[in-house]
Amino acid sequence: MQKYVCSVCGYVYDPADGEPDDPIDPGTGFEDLPEDWVCPVCGVDKDLFEPES
């Protein structure tokens, strides 16, 4: 699964790990995150994330 990087702070969302503090289950693809999900580090919207190259 594709990892996504926050263009503001560099946080990497890895679908294999999910986001346990949110709670987002492991295996949840970036496109399946809730629309109101924000970066857990800096709080920006998910539209400021880019696929990791």
Curated annotation (Swiss-Prot):
Cofactor(s) essential for the protein: Fe(3+)
Residue ranges occupied by any Rubredoxin-like domain in the UniProt entry: 1-53
Keyword Iron: yes
Protein name: Rubredoxin
Any Pfam family hit: Rubredoxin
UniProt organism field: Chlorobaculum thiosulfatiphilum
Residues reported in the UniProt entry to bind Fe cation: 6, 9, 39, 42
Keywords linked to the UniProt accession: Electron transport, Iron, Metal-binding, Transport
